[in-house]
């Protein structure tokens, strides 16, 4: 079970009070080769805590513990908009010069991501379309920014992209079922209980330039053709009340594919 340390957790009046939608977990590395000693993670967490107005993530994986800075479930300032608003958990991997600590911190990194993916109902797929685990590089390539982490540091410590994807999907050295952590109690380790809304995978997307509405579970997406059907999902007809994510049409097409977002694939056609 991952040990979460709240020493550097932001307090009242600190950090964002905005809830994040449950679409991504963004993974980073600290990119700080000037901080590779035994206290690397605590140094990074302390700095983020004291400078949160500039940038912070929810957690920093160290060799001994995972140090929390931002409250999971809320927006953190780690990857820019719109990734921040879509990510209830973002985590940094600390740098170490000691190979044993490199390995230990990586194990904590993977375990924390898998545990939080289970809490927030996020698929354990890496850098793919729709919901899932996203590297900061994926965010830069597809949404905003120029950061390329964490692949360079991972390569340096002997972790390929394929290995990262396997470890996220199956756990370190394992072949467990997707979205299962090594210990069923581990998702409660930070004393966080998701509410019913946070367990809900289905949500609406509004393409603000084309005025199109879609419904998606983060993997499959369908166009909503009629106002009556849309009203069901918006609770106008006392049926559902789904959360809404607003995007440009090009963003929707890039994330799900133009074939998937074609209006000919409207939800009424099954």
Curated annotation (Swiss-Prot):
Catalysed conversion reaction: Hydrolyzes the link between N-acetylmuramoyl residues and L-amino acid residues in certain cell-wall glycopeptides
Major subcellular site: secreted
SMART domains for this protein: Ami_2
GO biological process: cell wall organization; defense response to bacterium; peptidoglycan catabolic process; symbiont-mediated cytolysis of host cell
Cellular localization per UniProt: Secreted
Protein name: N-acetylmuramoyl-L-alanine amidase
Enzyme Commission code: 3.5.1.28
Keyword annotations: Antimicrobial, Bacteriolytic enzyme, Cell wall biogenesis/degradation, Hydrolase, Secreted
Family in the record: Belongs to the N-acetylmuramoyl-L-alanine amidase 2 family.
InterPro entries attached to this UniProt entry: Amidase/PGRP_sf, Amidase_domain
Entry-linked Pfam families: Amidase_2 (PF01510)
GO-annotated cellular components: extracellular region
Domain N-acetylmuramoyl-L-alanine amidase per the UniProt entry, residue ranges: 22-151
Enzyme class at the top of the EC tree: hydrolase
Domain of life: Viruses
One Gene Ontology molecular-function label: N-acetylmuramoyl-L-alanine amidase activity
